[in-house]
């Protein structure tokens, strides 16, 4: 949740750029995966990858 708020704070301020971003995609990425694999390392790596991808996507738009 904290990461989601930080990413949303960096979104473009003008409405045209903000509207071009997919709605609620970041929230879905962080909150939808409720299944955890037996290997704890794999789970944390996958979560970290989602965070980095979301932040890079926002900064590149």
Swiss-Prot record:
Protein origin, superkingdom: Viruses
Protein name: Uncharacterized protein 044R
Biological classification of the source: Viruses, Varidnaviria, Bamfordvirae, Nucleocytoviricota, Megaviricetes
């Amino acid at each position: 949740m904290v990461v989601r708020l930080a990413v949303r704070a960096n979104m473009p301020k003008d409405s045209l750029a903000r509207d071009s971003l997919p709605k609620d995609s970041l929230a879905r990425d962080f909150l939808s995966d409720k299944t955890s694999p037996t290997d704890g390392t794999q789970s944390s790596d996958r979560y970290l990858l989602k965070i980095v991808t979301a932040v890079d996507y926002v900064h590149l738009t």
